[in-house]
């Protein structure tokens, strides 16, 4: 897929860059694999705001039931079409298996309509095939990687992303993330070969506020223009944040505060994102 640029006929088209989706399926999604999706507008079941300034409005969407488990084992399937999914940044593919069942999978780059894909152990190392980490050679790009066997893919699911197998350590595979972190994952976990589609997603320029509203993104109000009752930065005469470091509405530091608190999985991190070796063994 290529990028689309626009002539500056209006202020909103000046500088706008979008992804050209001319090669994707133009019809409706597969009816048996979609369900309604209600917008919660950033509220929970009690009506309390859980996502400030970021949710509300936007175009109505149907949720595509993407199979992250790749549970159809040892049966070849054919890619029938590649589709746009409004709920995620990468594209999805509709796969029909020999018994007539259909599944939506994440679509990797270089996959084409008519290609064959398979799930299971000891399959061919080919883009779109899914297999345990123990069957994948070192250095291969993979996506949709499980963290626990049978739990479904959790890592590398957004547009243009992938991770790499950098080595083996007993019953674990060493996975190098795009952030530079190296992590141990059980070799029985499933992963799919290839780099995910739509790598140009990172190059788009929205161009106008209206397109952000179509995506469900509302304007963000700065804390410095609020009253003291609404935000720690509020109040004062003129534009001042009160002389304190930037914080969230609840007072948590907004600049570089470490928030990770899952010590039980520290033992699986071989190298942190900042390239220092983990001292906790």
UniProtKB/Swiss-Prot annotation:
Family, per entry: Belongs to the universal ribosomal protein uL2 family.
Keyword set, alphabetical order: Ribonucleoprotein, Ribosomal protein, RNA-binding, rRNA-binding
Cellular component, GO, one term: large ribosomal subunit
GO biological process: cytoplasmic translation
Pfam family, one: Ribosomal_L2
Disulfide bonds: none
Primary gene name: rplB
Protein name: Large ribosomal subunit protein uL2
Source species: Pelagibacter ubique (strain HTCC1062)
GO MF: rRNA binding; structural constituent of ribosome; transferase activity
